Amino acid sequence: MSSKEQKTPEGQAPEEIIMDRHEEIEAVEPEASAEQVDPRDEKIANLEAQLAEAQTRERDGILRVKAEMENLRRRTELDIEKAHKFALEKFINELLPVIDSLDRALEVADKANPDMSAMVEGIELTLKSMLDVVRKFGVEVIAETNVPLDPNVHQAIAMVESDDVAPGNVLGIMQKGYTLNGRTIRAAMVTVAKAKA
């Protein structure tokens, strides 16, 4: 046997061995180039990641500021609306004693006396006129009886036994209450019915 034949593995021709070794060398070369990553590429990747993070933070900040501005605008609109709606509250509170006095005058007036009829009629017209004016500005009277007690609009002064009115319902009004655009400015002082013992 010749020396060439001895070195080649069985069943392989010398050209095949050379080709196999050449493929092994090529396979090793890409690994070597992958290990030699350019440091500038790493720096570029880092900078791109930092830029993306900064853009995200900036976008979030802008959205947050826009949301805060929108909330501020809404709150301001609500405050202005409430200011317009309830600007008369102090004025109405000052008028309530006058309305109460007119109510009391009608309660104690001797309506059967013909000499007093003109005065009673004048008080009634004045009271009606006053109530019409305040109603134009959103004031409503709380003076219903035989309705369930509502702590938002009623202040219970006493409980009275009653057969006519269901327990827990308003039996009588001692002082009328008033609301301004749905907000209670003075609760009605009421007596509440209770079951007989």
UniProtKB/Swiss-Prot annotation:
A GO term, aspect molecular function: protein homodimerization activity
GO biological process: protein folding
Xref: Pfam families: GrpE
Subcellular location: Cytoplasm
Superkingdom in the source lineage: Bacteria
GO cellular component labels: cytosol
Keywords: Chaperone, Cytoplasm, Stress response
Region (Disordered): 1-40
Main location: cytoplasm
Residue pairs linked by disulfide bridges in the UniProt entry: none
Annotated InterPro entries: GrpE (IPR000740), GrpE_coiled_coil (IPR013805), GrpE_head (IPR009012)
Function: Participates actively in the response to hyperosmotic and heat shock by preventing the aggregation of stress-denatured proteins, in association with DnaK and GrpE. It is the nucleotide exchange factor for DnaK and may function as a thermosensor. Unfolded proteins bind initially to DnaJ; upon interaction with the DnaJ-bound protein, DnaK hydrolyzes its bound ATP, resulting in the formation of a stable complex. GrpE releases ADP from DnaK; ATP binding to DnaK triggers the release of the substrate protein, thus completing the reaction cycle.
Family assignment from sequence similarity: Belongs to the GrpE family.
Subunit structure: Homodimer.
Protein name (database record): Protein GrpE
Natural source organism: Shigella flexneri serotype 5b (strain 8401)
Gene: grpE
